[in-house]
From Swiss-Prot:
Disulfide bonds: none annotated. It is found in: Cytoplasm. Keywords: Acyltransferase, Amino-acid biosynthesis, Cytoplasm, Methionine biosynthesis, Transferase. This is Homoserine O-succinyltransferase. It catalyses: L-homoserine + succinyl-CoA = O-succinyl-L-homoserine + CoA. The gene is metAS. Pathway: Amino-acid biosynthesis; L-methionine biosynthesis via de novo pathway; O-succinyl-L-homoserine from L-homoserine: step 1/1. The lineage of its organism: Bacteria, Pseudomonadati, Pseudomonadota, Gammaproteobacteria, Aeromonadales. The record marks 111 as: Important for acyl-CoA specificity. GO terms for cellular component: cytoplasm. One of its GO terms (biological process) is L-methionine biosynthetic process from homoserine via O-succinyl-L-homoserine and cystathionine. SUPFAM superfamilies: Class I glutamine amidotransferase-like (SSF52317). Substrate binds at residues 163, 192, 249. Belongs to the MetA family.
Length: 315
């Protein structure tokens, strides 16, 4: 899917060099079709890196995707130039009157922080509640999935004894839903989190449909019956080197982390890691965009209202 982004956004140059179809504002102005409007709430410290990763995932379809970048507070980022944030990001007050086809809320390095201690927790609650009536489908990634379970279902934070880091096998539990169309019965996906998503706990306390689960990592992919909220507990958008950089960051910080599981050849951090989840990541985002966003969203977003009930898919 050609993604429509500002001409000067750093991701435009990077993705163009990768032969990914990027449509700048000037070119998109000559196409007389309505692009899908996707809002990205980027909570990750390295914002440019995350922008590139997610825009890469959104790029494989013949439709335009117009991406708006959202920031949640005015604190200066230690890892992203201030001028970049001021140039390309909007705050909630600037977009709250808009409606969107899709919303992606990223993870955040807050696994050991209680929700009430998160500086922007109240604003995040406001955004999630706002999305119910102003977004067709919202995709929550990693920490955002845990935060959404708290906001939408009242579930308290469940934390693992040690950080889960690595690439794990997952079993597809649902055959018919289009969100998992084309998934292998067993597939790999990366995780980097302290959050726990045990299947029994999720099943006992929510009405979510669970689509994929791992013996080591727990629930990986779930969604509400009306497809309006999608929960991904891992990081399918990660580049091949992202877990590597996080591992060395933790080493430098003296955390003494475990070597990411199933990641380095021979479990040797000196060897270049495999990117064994690439095809899965692209397929997950493509399915979400096509079936949960494009197929369900109204042409006139002003008519968007909260849907009720499930969707009868014809497979």
């Amino acid at each position: 899917m050609p993604i429509k982004i500002p001409d000067q956004l750093p991701a435009a140059g990077v993705l163009t060099e990768e032969n990914i179809f990027v449509m700048t504002d000037s070119r998109a102005a000559h196409q007389d079709i309505r692009p899908l409007k996707v809002l990205l709430l980027n909570l990750m410290p390295k914002k440019i890196e995350t922008e590139i990763q997610l825009m890469r995932m959104l790029s494989n379809s013949p439709l335009q995707v117009l991406v708006d970048l959202l920031r949640i507070d005015d604190r200066e980022s230690k890892n992203t130039p201030r001028i970049h944030v001021e140039t390309f990001y909007q705050d909630f007050d600037q977009i709250k009157d808009n409606k969107y086809d899709g919303l992606i809320i990223t993870g955040a390095p807050l696994g050991l922080v209680q929700f009430d201690d998160v500086v922007y927790w109240d604003t995040l609650i406001k955004i999630i509640e706002w999305s119910k009536k102003n977004v067709t489908s919202t995709l929550f990634l990693c920490w955002a999935a845990q935060a959404a379970l708290k906001v939408l279902y009242g579930l308290e934070k469940q934390t693992r004894g040690e950080k889960l880091s690595g690439v794990y096998y997952h079993h597809k539990l649902e055959q018919q839903d289009p969100l998992v169309r084309g998934f292998d019965d067993v597939f790999l996906a990366p995780h980097s989190r302290y959050a726990s998503f045990e299947g029994d706990f999720i099943r006992a306390n929510t009405d979510l449909r669970i689509f994929a689960e791992s013996e080591e990592a727990g629930v990986y992919l779930a969604a509400t019956k009306d497809c309006r909220q999608v929960f991904v507990t891992g990081h399918p958008e990660y580049d091949a080197e992202t877990l590597h950089h996080e591992y060395h960051r933790d080493l430098t910080a003296g955390i003494n982390p475990n070597v990411p599981a199933n990641y380095y050849p021979g479990n040797d951090p000196a060897r270049p890691p495999y990117h064994s989840w690439r095809s899965h990541g692209h397929l997950l985002f493509s399915n979400w965009l096509n079936y949960y966003v494009y197929q369900l969203t109204p042409y006139d977003l002003d008519t968007l209202d909260q849907k009720a009930g499930g969707v009868d898919w014809e497979i």
